[in-house]
Amino acid sequence: MDTEAGQIELELFEADAPNTVANFVKLAKDGFYDGLAFHRVIPGFMAQGGCPNSRDGAKGMPGTGGPGYNIDCEINGQKHQAGTLAMAHAGRNTGGSQFYICYEAQPHLDGVHTVFGLTGNMDVVKKLSNGSRINKVSIQDS
């Protein structure tokens, strides 16, 4: 993930959350995330992005948009720790495109949100602020 703050590497947990990972990969390959902002950044908690209403010129309020459909939660044994990549939602099975990266462990979110990856480059993640842009999300097969 190329951001204004720098590159953030993502390891996706396809075995733990296959549908969530497939959705994220599809959106990334379609360019959905390109130009979006991290619209909710709370130091010590998390940085949230992926809302199309954070795009320049969008009419909706940032944090309220999605891809036009919902995906089911895939709760798994992965824990919310520093660097966790998880799907945001407004209630069970209402996720779509918004995701967040944890700055540190958030055990109260375990079993509530789908953890579908882990980030590297936490030094870059910690540089994110409200409004930091995602330039492009590129997918590389391992």
Predicted regions and their residues:
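Cyclophilin-like peptidyl-prolyl cis-trans isomerases
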Residues: 1-142
